[in-house]
């Protein structure tokens, strides 16, 4: 993780990363590897999860990418102010938007594809969480709160036409409380959790990717 973060700090620029693959590797270096570490800890704590190690490892990387992509979308303008952008140049080029993003609100037109990708990863994150036994509520809630807050943040991003700082799309304290309450009420019931997250993510664009293929591409393990 430290090696990856150091590498990308030296590559940081206002011109964005080369392509989606480069973005995947960046998100893995700063977040996906954390998912792998937590999975190892969860399995050590709950040995019965060992049988699902490969599936959980793949989904854990997707989980981390979903959270990190949400942060990248939320903080795009704050990053731009310090001369950094993590969006892929290929996406910006496809949308016909001038780069770099400073002072260029039309860049928001290219966010939809990244929102869809992030949402797809967060769906994998939910599947990861549902693989944890329902009686392990501490582990489940730890994951669910992060996913719920990320989904609601994506909703704000998708429906904000001209946000210029991460603060503009930050979810409210009331929304945070609702996430915690909703997850506590439904945390033991897979069907209830699926319905809850379907409601929170209604209307969100979604692009699913193969978590196993992504894992094989970016993972260092």
Model-derived features with residue positions:
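Catalytic cores of Mg2+-dependent Asp-rich isoprenoid enzymes
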Residues: 1-66, 77-221
């Amino acid at each position: 993780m430290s090696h990856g973060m150091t590498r990308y700090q030296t590559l940081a620029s206002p011109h964005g990363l080369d392509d989606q693959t480069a973005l995947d590797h960046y998100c893995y270096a700063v977040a996906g590897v954390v998912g792998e570490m937590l999975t190892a800890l969860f399995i050590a704590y709950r040995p019965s999860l060992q049988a699902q190690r490969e599936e959980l490892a793949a989904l854990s990387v997707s989980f981390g990418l979903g959270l990190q992509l949400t942060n990248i979308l939320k903080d795009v303008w704050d990053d731009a102010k310090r001369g950094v952008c993590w969006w892929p140049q290929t996406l910006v080029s496809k949308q016909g938007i001038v780069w770099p993003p400073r002072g260029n609100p039309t860049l928001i037109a290219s966010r939809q594809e990244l929102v869809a990708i992030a949402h797809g990863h967060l769906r994998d994150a939910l599947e990861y969480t549902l693989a944890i036994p329902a009686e392990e509520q501490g582990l489940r809630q730890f994951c669910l709160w992060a996913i719920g807050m990320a989904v609601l943040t994506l909703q704000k991003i998708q429906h904000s036409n001209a946000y210029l700082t991460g603060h503009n799309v930050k979810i409210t304290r009331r929304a945070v409380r609702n996430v915690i309450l909703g997850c506590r009420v439904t945390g033991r019931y897979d069907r209830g959790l699926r319905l809850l997250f379907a409601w929170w993510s209604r209307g969100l664009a979604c692009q699913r990717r193969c978590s196993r293929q992504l894992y094989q591409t970016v993972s260092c393990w």
